[in-house]
């Protein structure tokens, strides 16, 4: 009873936390309110403005926002009260227990065991449209291009060569499937093993291992043969490395081993997806800024040289090799807003209307414009590709002019263009997973999936393991925001750096996505879920010495973390 009274009297004194708690709760409530205004009458990504549009604000919409605010604020408050009592659950009492390498293999085997029904049903995995393009490049039916990262294409080529040696492309793709499954299981196992070495309790390790094994988005992404799985895995390793830096308070940043690991991970993240370069630049800058007082000149110089080398290879060298073939580019979000204004007959001058008409016939725009998918416009003959890529400056000026005249239309267009990345209530099947073969794959390469369970037993379990409920990408970004909030509550401010690569990934997608729903773009947010529950409790190495004392003492003893 006395404990219950203490809980009721609890009052947080962290003003920054309280302020951000109100801000994040309000952001969530606003997304719920804005979602309630969207009338969506189609489950297809090609939905037109007849199928998806904004309605007028009603009392019901306002109440949805208010109720959402109250519910989220209440939940956060309950967690806020309970979270201070959870250190005993998160950490082992015996921190001097010797660390055994066989724990890694136990975790690895457990994850693979849970994945086995998926592996035996969908082996070797599903080839996506982008991967199909990479295969076409590998067999010389398309020219090599870094639009789909060339490193990923060359990785596929290595395995196709293995298939050539055996006179069977099926063997090559099977080998690639096994490789990706093994690497993904190993990376996830390494994360749990890393927590084990940080003295997290066996209970926490078991929960995370079970999550990796049971949650469908892990085995299905291990079986999704597209660039996003390896990219997110190397990005996840990069994040674990950032966490290692944080737990050592940046004292390892000048170590030769750390410099090599950090540089290699920067290179891998940059080359496995094109937005990775911006992610590592932003993250590295902040890491350097936070730990600059540690005299990390070696780290700064090494990171700078690595960034310059990456730029030199991806820029001038790739251009010389003919891998950067596009003579120009456009921002899908920007063009989508301009076309939305045109398709909805927004406010514009006759001159602006003519300019848009040159970009793409306005009458045709009204027929083919889809606010959720920009790529439905680009194939039509009326889309003037040459004009758009050579008139970037003029288009940007037009974008600003129309923004001033049509702010509401711009907000609506942007909201629909990025719908799946901010709206927790919306999820489509498009680019959610790729465990099935893309249509036409067998026309270019003789490979197929084998359902071994059906082959051996005469019955398939596809209906049992197929995705039945899809989760919005926005759920996972809000999990990160909530986790950051509790990290701030516990005053572990440097731990916030660990979230940055995932947030920057989401941010780059929000700036330039051509499609409103694509879990693969931000799959790193899913990989981050166990981290979200760990980071608020992650301590610096020097604090480990105090854990045993803290956990061993009575409840009335308090330990200062910072």
Please provide the spans of the model-predicted regions.
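Extracytoplasmic catalytic/substrate-binding loops of multi-pass membrane glycan-assembly enzymes
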Residues: 122-134, 143-159, 163-171, 524
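Membrane-proximal stem/loop segments at transmembrane-domain junctions that anchor or position
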Residues: 322-447
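Transmembrane-helix motifs of polytopic, lipid-linked glycan transferases
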Residues: 74, 178-199, 237
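Start-transfer (signal-anchor) and selected internal transmembrane alpha helices
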Residues: 1-32, 55-115, 540-548, 553
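Loop-to-helix entry region of an early transmembrane alpha helix in multi-pass inner-membrane enzymes
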Residues: 60-62, 150-154, 165-186
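Membrane-interface anchor segments at the N-terminal boundary of transmembrane helices
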Residues: 171-175, 416-499
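Transmembrane-helix signature of polytopic, membrane-embedded enzymes
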Residues: 101-106, 191-214, 232-233
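Membrane-interface alpha helices of multi-pass inner-membrane proteins
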Residues: 258-273, 284-285, 303-310
């Amino acid at each position: 009873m006395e404990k219950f009274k203490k809980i009721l009297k609890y009052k947080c004194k962290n003003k920054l936390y309280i302020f951000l708690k109100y801000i994040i709760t309000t952001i969530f409530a606003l997304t719920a309110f804005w979602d309630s205004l969207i009338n969506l009458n189609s489950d297809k990504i090609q939905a037109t403005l007849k199928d998806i549009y904004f309605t007028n604000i009603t009392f019901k919409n306002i109440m949805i926002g208010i109720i959402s605010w109250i519910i989220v604020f209440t939940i956060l408050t309950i967690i806020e009260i309970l979270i201070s009592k959870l250190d005993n659950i998160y950490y082992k009492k015996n921190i001097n227990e010797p660390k055994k390498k066989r724990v890694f293999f136990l975790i690895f085997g457990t994850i693979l065991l849970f994945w086995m029904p998926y592996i035996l049903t969908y082996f070797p995995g599903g080839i996506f449209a982008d991967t199909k393009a990479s295969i076409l490049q590998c067999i010389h039916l398309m020219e090599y291009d870094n639009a789909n990262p060339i490193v990923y294409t060359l990785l596929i080529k290595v395995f196709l060569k293995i298939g050539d040696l055996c006179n069977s492309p099926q063997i090559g793709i099977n080998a690639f499937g096994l490789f990706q499954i093994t690497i993904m299981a190993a990376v996830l196992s390494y994360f749990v093993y890393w927590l084990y070495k940080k003295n997290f309790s066996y209970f926490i390790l078991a929960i995370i291992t079970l999550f990796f094994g049971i949650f469908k988005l892990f085995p299905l992404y291990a079986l999704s043969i597209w660039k996003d799985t390896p990219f997110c895995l190397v990005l996840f390793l990069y994040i674990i490395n950032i966490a290692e830096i944080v737990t050592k308070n940046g004292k390892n940043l000048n170590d030769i081993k750390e410099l090599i690991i950090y540089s290699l991970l920067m290179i891998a993240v940059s080359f496995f997806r094109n937005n990775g370069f911006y992610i590592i630049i932003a993250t590295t800058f902040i890491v350097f800024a936070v730990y600059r007082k540690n005299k990390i000149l070696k780290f700064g110089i090494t990171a700078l040289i690595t960034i310059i080398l990456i730029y030199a290879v991806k820029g001038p060298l790739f251009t010389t090799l003919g891998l950067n073939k596009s003579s120009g580019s456009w921002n899908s979000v920007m063009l989508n807003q301009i076309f939305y204004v045109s398709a909805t007959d927004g406010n514009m001058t006759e001159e602006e209307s003519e300019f848009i008409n040159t970009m793409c016939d306005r009458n045709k725009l009204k027929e083919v414009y889809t606010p959720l998918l920009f790529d439905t416009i680009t194939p039509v003959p009326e889309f003037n590709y040459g004009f758009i890529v050579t008139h970037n400056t003029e288009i940007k000026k037009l974008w600003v002019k129309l923004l001033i005249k049509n702010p509401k239309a711009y907000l609506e267009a942007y909201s629909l263009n990025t719908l799946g990345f901010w709206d927790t209530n919306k999820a489509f099947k498009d680019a959610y997973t790729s465990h099935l073969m893309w249509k036409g794959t067998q026309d270019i390469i003789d490979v197929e999936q084998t359902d071994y369970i059906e082959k051996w037993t005469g019955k398939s379990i596809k209906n049992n393991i197929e995705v039945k409920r899809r989760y919005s990408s926005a759920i996972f970004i809000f999990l990160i925001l909530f986790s950051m909030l509790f990290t701030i509550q516990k005053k572990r401010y440097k731990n916030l750096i660990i979230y940055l690569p995932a947030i920057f990934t989401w941010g780059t997608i929000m700036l330039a996505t051509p499609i409103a729903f694509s879990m693969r773009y931000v799959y790193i947010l899913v990989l981050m879920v166990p981290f979200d529950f760990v980071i608020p409790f992650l301590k610096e190495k020097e604090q480990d010495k105090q854990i045993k004392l803290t956990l061993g003492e009575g409840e009335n003893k308090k330990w200062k973390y910072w």
